[in-house]
Amino acid sequence: MQRVSELLSFLSAFRCDFFILPTPVTCPRYSVKAMKILQTLPLLVLFSSCQAHKDFFTSIGHMTDLLYTEKDLLTSLKDYIRAEELKLEQIKKWAEKFDSLSEMATNDPEGFLGHPVNAFKLMKRLNTEWLELENLVLKDMSDGFISNLTVQRQQFPTDEDQTGAAKALIRLQDTYNLDTETISKGNLPGVKHQPTLNAEDCFELGKIAYTEADYYHTELWMEQALQQLDAGEESSIDKVLVLDYLSYAVYQQGDLEKALKLTKRLLELDPEHQRGNGNLKYFEYIMTKEENKSSSSDSKDAEPKTKKGRPIDHLPERQKYEMLCRGEGIKMTPRRQKRLFCRYYDGNRNPTFILSPSKQEDEWDKPRIVRYHEIISDKEIEKVKELAKPRLRRATVHDPVTGQLTTAQYRVSKSAWLSGYEDPVIARINARIQELTGLDVSTAEELQVANYGMGGQYEPHFDFARASNTLGS
């Protein structure tokens, strides 16, 4: 409970989708372990599958559709392989048949052709059977597979999706302080599967960081790729290519000595590398220039060289935000913890909850934040998912400059909005929220269903405009 309380305390300063309510009727405390379903009333976070759409990386639901697309393609590929194998078996039988006849005939050509049946069959083979074999060899068994692939390719992810997925992985790396080797080996905490990254995967992550001018992460992932290649891993990429990217990324971070060392190693592998030779001369020139400068000046005045680290983030609360994601951050004192309780709440004597009170849990004291459990049934949840599935679209944010809604890199999710008139289930949920909180939902937003994508992200924010960020300005 303490870890959740810390998170909620921080989020309460930004967006808070929980309700702060008057002190309820206190009932005997029950075990929190008995609470099976946790639902935040105005916002349901949904992981569901839906129709194919762009920006796959922003929705786990849409990404699950890709798994089934790939499975269908794999089935089609296996069918193609079986067809090709059957074709080869037939060709082998033709070859074996012709081989035995040719061996017999060439040993005694005149005697062989002296038999009229052999002469007839020779004419037949060359005029008919070899033509049949030609048609068999020319028969394209890939038509079915290619047709299916062409159709499915329309739903394939784009370069933007691949870049988004890579950025999400890097974001998780930073948030949870994970090193590249841990991620590469798949040893992530709390996961069921342990997929590994090969050297080519690590190189691709580094390359995407490079295109974003993020040389800090470029260095991390290129070094991991190089480490795996040095360990003997077979790969389609070579060390020269990795060293080319790595040396430049290191140079961009101010470590000229290491960049020079890496460039020399590159040239040992490929002495004719044009860019490597150019960089070597340039790095040596810069180092000589700096050495002359430092020797001519007072050593006491020389500033220590500091290597650039992780890129500076625009969000002032970034450090606290990531600490809370890791379960660190603000700690509540034992005295304050003792004031937090679990109770049955009757909605201020609301008839709906008198006989069947809701389960309420204190999460934070100041400001007061409570959590409600088992407010929505599994059946209702599935219905909400069913209704939202075809409507999920990339979530947007308000642009303070244009006043328009636009997508943002820091909001990696898709959303759908459901009204009470669309289905009785939504109407019941809205009525339940109103009865529990005492608020009139007729003036509230529609029920929002959000499906977060890979490394699901929505940075801390206010739901109101500040003086420095006026709406429409």
Short names for language-model regions:
Residues 1-44, 236-238:
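Classical eukaryotic N-terminal signal peptides for Sec-dependent ER targeting/secretion
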Residues 31, 36-473:
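Fe(II)/2-oxoglutarate oxygenase catalytic core
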